[in-house]
């Protein structure tokens, strides 16, 4: 629960859930529904994660890149800002913001190896050209706070920092970036929700520890339910649904 989060641009940009689930008019004209909108962002989050594994950047860079991508689509339509190019550009920008710089040409090289049919038309100049547009869409606010630091501190404080709990909670936090939680909730509260889910799964009673935090558990449990709902809905995601969503943007997969 870093003290300077509350004075940060990240805190000031937190949104209400209904502000996040808004399809822009240009996208609506293409028939994009709210489910399509979420599905495309989910798909691009996976692309960023997979590409990051190949270029070997820290998880924080991945999380920042996905946050940038999701912030862009609060203000810009997918018709205006092509999702694949935005995803690539956000990873490039995040690597610089997090001081773990990746060469743009390496991004182009690896993404074409991973997804040759989807990214064959993109070159170095496209990423560099989109970079300024993304920066403008972000209002040049590049600072992002993540749940990871709070997660480690909470696990240690609750005496839950064994290897298994670390792996489970870290994995859940990673999965939250396939959703818009980071745009809506303070990162420390997302961390608490992930610990809550893991503690129930592992049958660890940490009720007293949560009570000592004097945190609103209704808020924590609501986030936990959002995560669990995502896991349930994740099972129904098919390649056919992804293709259908992208086809409405006239983006051939």
Swiss-Prot record:
Claim: Transferase is one of the keywords in the record: no
GO process terms (BP):
cell division; regulation of transcription by RNA polymerase II
GO MF entries: cyclin-dependent protein serine/threonine kinase regulator activity
Q: Does the keyword Transmembrane apply?
A: no
> SUPFAM superfamilies, from UniProt?
Cyclin-like
Q: Sorted alphabetically, which keywords does the UniProt record give? A: Cell cycle, Cell division, Cyclin
Q: Which InterPro entries match?
A: Cyclin-like_dom, Cyclin-like_sf, Cyclin/Ssn8, Cyclin_N
UniProt similarity note? Belongs to the cyclin family. Cyclin C subfamily.
The protein here is known as: Cyclin-C1-1
Species annotation: Arabidopsis thaliana (Mouse-ear cress)
Query: Lineage of the source organism?
Result: Eukaryota, Viridiplantae, Streptophyta, Embryophyta, Tracheophyta
């Amino acid at each position: 629960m870093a003290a300077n989060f509350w004075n940060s641009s990240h805190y000031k940009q937190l949104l209400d859930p209904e502000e996040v689930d808004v399809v822009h008019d240009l996208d609506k004209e293409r028939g994009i529904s709210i489910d399509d909108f979420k599905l495309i962002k989910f798909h691009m989050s996976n692309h960023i994660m997979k590409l990051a594994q190949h270029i070997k950047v820290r998880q924080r860079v991945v999380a920042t890149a996905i946050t940038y991508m999701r912030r862009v689509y609060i203000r810009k339509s997918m018709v205006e800002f092509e999702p694949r190019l935005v995803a690539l550009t956000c990873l490039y920008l995040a690597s610089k913001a997090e001081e773990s710089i990746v060469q743009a040409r390496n991004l182009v090289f690896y993404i074409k190896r991973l997804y040759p049919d989807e990214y064959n038309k993109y070159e170095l100049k496209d990423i560099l050209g989109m970079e300024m547009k993304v920066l403008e869409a972000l209002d040049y606010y590049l600072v992002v706070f993540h749940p990871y630091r709070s997660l480690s501190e909470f696990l240690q404080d609750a005496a839950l920092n064994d290897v298994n709990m670390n792996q489970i909670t870290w994995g859940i936090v990673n999965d939250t970036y396939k959703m818009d939680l980071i745009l809506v909730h303070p990162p420390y509260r997302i961390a608490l929700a992930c610990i809550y889910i893991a503690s129930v799964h592992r049958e660890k009673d940490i009720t007293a520890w949560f009570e000592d935090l004097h945190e609103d558990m209704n808020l924590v449990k609501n986030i936990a339910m959002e995560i669990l709902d995502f896991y349930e809905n994740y099972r129904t995601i098919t390649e056919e649904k992804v293709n259908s969503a992208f086809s409405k943007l006239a983006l051939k997969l």
